[in-house]
Amino acid sequence: MTDVDKKDPQYKQIFLERFRKKLQSDKTGMSDLESFVELPEGITPVAASIGPIKRGSEPLPPWLKLNVPKGMTHRPRFNRIRRSMREKKLSTVCEEAKCPNIGECWGGGEDNGAATATIMVMGSHCTRGCRFCSVLTSRRPPPLDPDEPEKVAAAVHEMGVDYIVMTMVDRDDLPDGGASHVSRCIRTIKEQNPELMLEALVGDFHGDLKVVEQLAATPLSVYAHNIECVERITPRVRDHRATYKQSLQTLEHVTKWTNGKMLTKSSIMLGLGEEEEEVRQTLRDLRTAGVSAVTLGQYLQPSRTRLKVSRYAHPKEFEMWEKEAMSMGFLYCASGPMVRSSYRAGEYYIKNIVKQRENAKGATTMEAVTAADAVAAGA
């Protein structure tokens, strides 16, 4: 529009009118953005859109529309956990990720003695940029809080929960990935809460097995590391520093190094473009690595900048995967659309497995651990 001065008050209106006419007179037979914009190589028109960005191409299916229980904020245990976290300025994945199961987990103790909460340590900024995760990313996050282990331990004591899940952000900027800090958090929590069952959901620490051993040597009840998705789509879904084989190696090493006495756990998301046989193979790979507990849940896009959902798996499919996982030899499997890696982590069955394995810690063979698992299964 070289014939119209940009300073002209009518410039915008004239431009829009001419652009509309160009769209109407298009003779290419194409009516999308590709007709008017030369996109860079490797970028398809699907990657660009005009208008409001939607969180998914389809509306949520009915099984993902939950009714929030009324009166949850008036339940004593729910409020006690929330108040303790606020006062000590600590973060929970339950709130950060807007988990739909927060009421069931935090208030669980009032119904079945299995209240759980998930605390995130080492700050709120991660050095990795997985495309499914909503946690903030930074190359140089703020320094660690040296008082965090004591704060977390005190908060856990005040919560009065039976089972705590402690997760972490990746800190590739630190020499040991933050393992020494996480280890101190674990030991401090257990010192102040000796009867508590503690699950640590940790990263891969670049596959440094010595660092993995450092964490496995702490008084943990469950060592968890999520494989997240099937192998084929891992490069697209996870940060390039997190690989499928590295995750399997981490989990397998914990099992072997502890002679099977440490319960290992992992999680798989559905709805990222995986095929049925790929999910089955991932379960096989986890079981071969010695993983005893697994969860499967529906991936939901946390923000506009994250990966879109490829499909919504039906509840019947999740039931199928639970049956298959148990038939493969997993001791525990939680599988459902709203299941997350820490979902009802402290429920009776998994707690019983942990107790039986702790009783078998004096044993020196895998057979003794297997016998303990059999006792737990029959409880």
UniProtKB/Swiss-Prot annotation:
Location in the cell: Mitochondrion
Keyword Metal-binding on entry: yes
SUPFAM superfamilies, per the entry: Radical SAM enzymes
Primary localization: mitochondrion
Reaction(s) catalysed (UniProt annotation): [[Fe-S] cluster scaffold protein carrying a second [4Fe-4S](2+) cluster] + N(6)-octanoyl-L-lysyl-[protein] + 2 oxidized [2Fe-2S]-[ferredoxin] + 2 S-adenosyl-L-methionine + 4 H(+) = [[Fe-S] cluster scaffold protein] + N(6)-[(R)-dihydrolipoyl]-L-lysyl-[protein] + 4 Fe(3+) + 2 hydrogen sulfide + 2 5'-deoxyadenosine + 2 L-methionine + 2 reduced [2Fe-2S]-[ferredoxin]
Tagged with keyword Iron-sulfur: yes
Top class in the EC scheme: transferase
Cofactor needs: [4Fe-4S] cluster
Positions that bind [4Fe-4S] cluster 1: C94, C99, C105, S342
EC number(s) reported in the record: 2.8.1.8
One Pfam family of this chain: Radical_SAM
Pathway: Protein modification; protein lipoylation via endogenous pathway; protein N(6)-(lipoyl)lysine from octanoyl-[acyl-carrier-protein]: step 2/2
InterPro entries named among the record's database cross-references: Aldolase_TIM, Elp3/MiaA/NifB-like_rSAM, LIAS_N, Lipoyl_synth, rSAM
UniProt entry keywords in alphabetical sequence: 4Fe-4S, Iron, Iron-sulfur, Metal-binding, Mitochondrion, S-adenosyl-L-methionine, Transferase
GO CC list: mitochondrion
Similarity comment: Belongs to the radical SAM superfamily. Lipoyl synthase family.
Note: This protein may be expected to contain an N-terminal transit peptide but none has been predicted.
Protein name: Lipoyl synthase, mitochondrial
Originating species: Leishmania braziliensis
